[in-house]
Amino acid sequence: MKTVKMVLAALLVSASTHAFAANPVEFWGCKFADGYDMSDLMAHTEAFNKIVDDLPDRKYSAWIMTPFFSNNMSAVDFWWVGAWDSNTNMGGGFDEFLAAKDGAAWFAKYQAMSNCEVHTLMTSTNIRMASE
């Protein structure tokens, strides 16, 4: 019985590992342009969410992150981090967003509000999920 439990546990771990395939994660490290601050950005994210809510692709997650500790605390004011479940959905999501009625205008304002000198696309593989 112990062997059966071990095999089942191994299969579950294997299955859950395969469920978390490598996925694209985009990072924008940004400083606020003169006259803008976090309250402006958060208001702008409300407009972003309204645009994205009207798109057929629901495979995008996004976070605003602010430095809590860094070896260079003045490098960025915030990070915009976005993630998709696949490269295919990332490409489709970009196309849908920029083709949306207000998508390109939203992005132009985002660029006016911030100077994002850091723009990186990475592949992320989840190696551990938090337990309850």
Predicted regions and their residues:
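Bacterial N-terminal signal peptides that target proteins for export
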Residues: 1-8
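Short S/T/G/P-rich N-terminal loop/turn motif that feeds into the first structured element of a domain
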Residues: 5, 13, 17-101, 112-132
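Non-heme di-metal
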Residues: 106-107
